[in-house]
Amino acid sequence: MSHSVSLTFPDGSVREFAAGTTGRDVAESISKSLAKKAVAIALDGELRDLSDPIADGKIEIVTREDKRALELIRHDAAHVMAEAVQELWPGTQVTIGPVIDNGFYYDFAKNEPFTPDDLPVIEKKMKEIIARNNPFSKEVWSRDKAKEVFAAKGESYKVELVDAIPEGQDLKIYYQGDWFDLCRGPHMASTGQIGTAFKLMKVAGAYWRGDSNNPMLTRIYGTAWHTQEELDQYLHVLAEAEKRDHRRLGREMDLFHFQEEGPGVVFWHGKGWRVFQSLVAYMRRRLEVDYQEVNAPQVLDKSLWETSGHWGWYRDNMFKVTVAGDETDDDRVFALKPMNCPGHIQIFKHGLKSYRELPVRMAEFGAVHRYEPSGALHGLMRVRGFTQDDAHIFCTDEQMAAECLKINDLILSVYEDFGFKEIVVKLSTRPDKRVGSDALWDRAEAVMTDVLNTIEAQSEGRIKTGILPGEGAFYGPKFEYTLKDAIGREWQCGTTQVDFNLPERFGAFYIDKDSEKRQPVMIHRAICGSMERFLGILLENYAGHMPLWISPLQVVVATITSDADDYGREVAARLREAGLTVETDFRNEKINYKIREHSVTKVPVIVVCGKREAEERSVNIRRLGSQAQTAMSLEEAVAALSSEAMAPDLKRKMERSARAA
């Protein structure tokens, strides 16, 4: 028996449609032009094919310009790429091809792997297929039919995928012209709606199902966008990112390296360690008034990690430690700490705490180790051993809001000192699986929502805020701080997390004003997150042109002739006395050669001394990236460079002292 379908539109209006009505029918009932522009529908927020019969719910007609259409554009482009490959190289097997961040890929089984030279050929064929504007259509097949058809085509990987689909689940087959593939969908109306704003990016190897015991396939990555302008912008950012790649800069600037014997751990060179220590020193100064710096052990018995819960839910990411020698009675299992928090709770618990002592703020530049798959490692950005600028605040419920605001002020101030102006702060709320009562979460989320509103109001709109529903940790809600770099990329760095779990697990308490035991609120706080990763972000943000105060090498004194070497030594000594890191270059080379060489290693200031400068007791200053030279007296140069090389927090301190004098 037929019945009507009730649809609610974005403007709140409700209309009835006959059963069996499709999304395309609904679009046509509004206007022919809308139906022509439509690529899909969203029913209760879920994207569906235009050809799907509708059911009761909230409906939106999705056009190609809609942000949500980008996923469909990329999905359809992946299918067209697969069709192009099989047209060009018959017998090639198509395996899987998902949409990923900024693009898509497909894995292929081919006797001779693809090379980068094949990509333009595939792109040309893709444009031909798109120009055909074949409609996408969907069929539902039985498991047996799907296996029979794919087996007949020699698609053994597709047969395996069909076998993996649970019994009773529909097998959807999408056609574009005569070509078809197994796919969950949805797709747009036709291949022509993909457009031509796409590019195939690279070829890589990939094991079938990610298992090294399986055959190696060839993966082709691509990207697709709404418009050519968006594609061009994306490619520009990629080119900029490649120029700014911190791994390349690390080599050029002689900062660090990695090697096979220590996967995911950094070998810091002298200059790199200098800038790392400058960052630590800066962070340490920012904490010296409000925090006590502590140090928890690197290696702890697994029983502590069992109590914390890490051994149960994080063990696969932990490094287990046992005694190497056979001649020992100690058979206990230890682990390198992946996090500092359990150690800090032990320090808090050591001795009775009164409510009068709260908040207790502990900070540690703690070396932690976490296992990451080798394929996930990426320079300083993704490592196995790193340093956290970690802090934990133990406070009362009533102090939580003030502490979160205090943390926020510190985080924003630090980011501003490093030149990051565009910051987004988002509150992640309770997930489905969590510890703690609803009342506890209600209280924490209410407090943190008020804090979020205060952050936005105090910044007068400069700081953007938002909510991430259900994205909180299982132990409490959290703030996430995301900063935007010089080429528009976003980096999530800082966090403020409220924890109801660990204090309870470890039995941490303080004595309240009524002499009763109370569980403290524990707030986890990180600003840089990983110090190594933050340095990688800084290197890429500045393209190696680091601010003078955090530069690994601040000045090179280079002489034009040997007659100026003695004066050059005096200049270098004066600059070192003023606190700058200085090297000299008195080689018998032309000055332009020296300048070019030091520019490659991103030395921010080259102080040039010749015979005339020695006689006049002056210098010429050459800045990285500039052809101009600035002449000034030695005294002026020392004063100017020492002032510029002073860290922002020390400048503020000096200015406050001057005002108070």
From Swiss-Prot:
UniProtKB keywords: Aminoacyl-tRNA synthetase, ATP-binding, Cytoplasm, Ligase, Metal-binding, Nucleotide-binding, Protein biosynthesis, RNA-binding, tRNA-binding, Zinc
Q: Which GO terms describe its cellular component?
A: cytosol
Q: Which InterPro entries match?
A: aa-tRNA-synt_IIb (IPR002314), aa-tRNA-synth_II (IPR006195), aa-tRNA-synth_II/BPL/LPL (IPR045864), Anticodon-bd (IPR004154), Anticodon-bd_dom_sf (IPR036621), Beta-grasp_dom_sf (IPR012675), TGS (IPR004095), TGS-like (IPR012676)
Q: Where is the major localization of this protein? A: cytoplasm
Q: Where is this region: Catalytic?
A: 245-547
- Entry binding sites for Zn(2+): 341, 392, 524
Q: Does the keyword Cytoplasm apply?
A: yes
**Which biological process annotations from GO are given for this protein?**
threonyl-tRNA aminoacylation
Q: What is its EC number?
A: 6.1.1.3
Subcellular localization, per the record?
Answer: Cytoplasm
User: One Pfam annotation, family name?
Assistant: tRNA_SAD
Question: Which residues are in the TGS domain?
Answer: 1-64
Q: How does it assemble?
A: Homodimer.
Spell out the protein name for this chain. Answer: Threonine--tRNA ligase
The organism encoding this protein is Sinorhizobium fredii (strain NBRC 101917 / NGR234)
